[in-house]
Amino acid sequence: MFLIKVKTIKFQNSTILIKNFFKILFFLFIISCSSNDYNTEFPNQNNDEEDENEFAEIDYGLTEYGITYQGIDRDFSIYIPESYTHDSPSAMMFVFHGFGGSNDMIMYYSDFNSISERENFIVVYPQGSSFWGYPHWNVGGWTNTSSADDIGFVDFLIELISQEYNLNQNRIYATGMSNG
């Protein structure tokens, strides 16, 4: 849990501050109620009889994963639209949250899941590392105290997801908010 510093500002009507405070508390309550259950491996990873031409059984909808990359526990979610098949290569979109955000938050307010259903592409929501107590992406510059190799993490995810789903390697895209 983290604390939110509330700066007191004198208003003629203090109900504005109180309403915003309760909105923030409600939002934090909703986030804290979310489940942390996630898969630690893809369905086909432990298959002793792997066939290089055979993809995993399709798990439509949203699936959350947790992995360790370069000694750091990392999370990501994948959304597979109902229209996806292994028969034709699919585009993939990475959606990056901003500084202090989360993959769950950007998924909810970006609405890429419904867009992927309409346009038939896979969506990946990676979670940034949290070296200062706030999730963020190591983009150099002002985040230079972060030692996370986020470019390597994304490359690793592309490789990992390509093993399970038929991706068009020429149609891998990224979007994000702020630090994402």
Where are these regions (language model features)?
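Serine-hydrolase catalytic machinery in alpha/beta-hydrolase-like enzymes
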Residues: Y69-S77, D87-Y173
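Sec-dependent signal peptide recognition
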Residues: K19-F27
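Alpha-helical and His/Cys-centered functional microenvironments
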Residues: I16, E49, G101
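Short intrinsically disordered, low-complexity coil segments enriched in acidic
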Residues: M1-F2, E159, G176, G180
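N-terminal secretory signal peptides that target proteins for export/translocation
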Residues: M1-I18
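A domain-start/cap signature at the N-terminus of enzymes
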Residues: C33-M92, R118, I151, R171, ...
